[in-house]
Amino acid sequence: MSATKSSLKSTLAVSLTNYLDAGAIVAGASGLTLWQSYLGLSEGHLGWLNAISANCLGAAIGAIIGGFLADKYGRKAIYTYNMLVYMLGVALIMVSVNFPMLLLGFLVTGISVGVGVPASWTYISENSEVGNRGRNIGISQMAWGIGPLIILLLGTLLAPPTGEAASGGLLFGLSEVVGGWFGVEGAALNVFSSRIVFFSLFVVAFIAWNLQRRLDESAEWKAAKAEAEKQPKQATAGSVFASFGKLFTNKTNIFTMLFLCGMYLTWNLVCSVMGFFQPHIYETAGGLSNEYANLLAAGQWLVIIATTFVFSLIVDKVKQRWLYAVGVSFGVLAWVIVLFLGINSLSGLLFFTLLWALQAGISVQSFYALWASELFPAKYRAAAQGVMFFIVRGLSAVWGLAFVYIYGENGQGFTLAASIMLAFFVIPLLIGTIGAPVTRGKTLEQITRERYGDDF
């Protein structure tokens, strides 16, 4: 098998991690009002679900653990066991009958997602050819779009009649049949739609586990490991977190992490809220039914996938600085338009959804995944990503808790929340456009030598 085909095959297998990451977030989002009705949850409860989920703190905890584990024991070690933890978390959500069970399921799933992210982005970059790193990261981001699309379509088909809708989705009868086996009705019956959606993630996680545990170890990690073993024992001894100090004692590392966190953090503050609360916002502030909110969001993900595909074709061939600037500008314009036209306006919702989809297709996350895997040496490449992901998702958890109180029970604070998110989006536009590195066409070893010298 050629190197190009091999890297593409491994990219597709590892990309299932992105599918399950975004899928877990959107599965929670698409059924949020159903769980709220079933368990009698307040906006504060919803804020906690977001805060500890794959969207925020759960992933943050998993990332800092997974990053160091991937550097010490290898990328393959993560793929051998992590999906089993994901399946456990999803299973807990599927059988939840109270808020603590649901919260625990979201937390376990989130931790698993976080553990897998640094290893997956690092593995993809290390197994890509020089001219295909951006393409392969783009393909992995397509999985990040395909997951929500499938989940939202499934959620739409299974949606119960809510809001002004006279009937449920085309497959709501399946939920009624399954719910009937357990003798449930009302809100308890409606939430079976969400349980089935999470079951679909369980199935995909099982497939991912079988594919990923058969992957070969990263050749670059093995080379870095072999080089480290040649060093005196006292230079390499230490715990799993032995490289933690090295990250913060090198000026190049510090400036790189400040740059990457600066561009990714405020973007993620906005996108974490939209990833988890978008259908809920469309229902409460926008006045749509659960079915139509999910359908509009699903249409958005179709545009995201198409835009990401175009991104994957051109990112290795154009100046990445300007491609980045165009993508983030779409997001800034989206918030300007929704503030001007209003969330209650159908035209405002449609324009916002389209522009939001375009920015997500050429997303800050795509560039973050690419640059974060290029700008650090192999020996702590995943650990550096784990630290940054921990910071970003951890602070996103705090913002998610604040957002629900700003937004209000029925969206009365939407204008203020949207104004804040517009301000958040301007920050990565400036930081990323000004500080974009020039790495296109260079090997990872060449980039490392240029930035760190021969000692690394």
PLM feature segments, named:
Residues G105-M142:
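Cytoplasmic helix-loop-helix junction between adjacent transmembrane helices
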Residues A29-I61:
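Extracellular/periplasmic helix-loop-helix junction of adjacent transmembrane segments
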Residues M1-V26, S37:
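Cytosolic juxtamembrane N-terminal segment immediately preceding the first transmembrane helix
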Residues A63-G74, T308-Q320:
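Helix-to-loop junctions at the C-terminal end of transmembrane segments
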Residues G134-G163, V204, F389-G400:
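Glycine-rich segments within core transmembrane alpha-helices of 12-TM secondary carriers
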Residues G74, V95-P100, L341-N344:
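Helix-breaking motifs and short loop linkers at transmembrane-helix boundaries and internal kinks
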Residues A29, K251-T308, G400:
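Extracytoplasmic gate region of multi-pass secondary transporters
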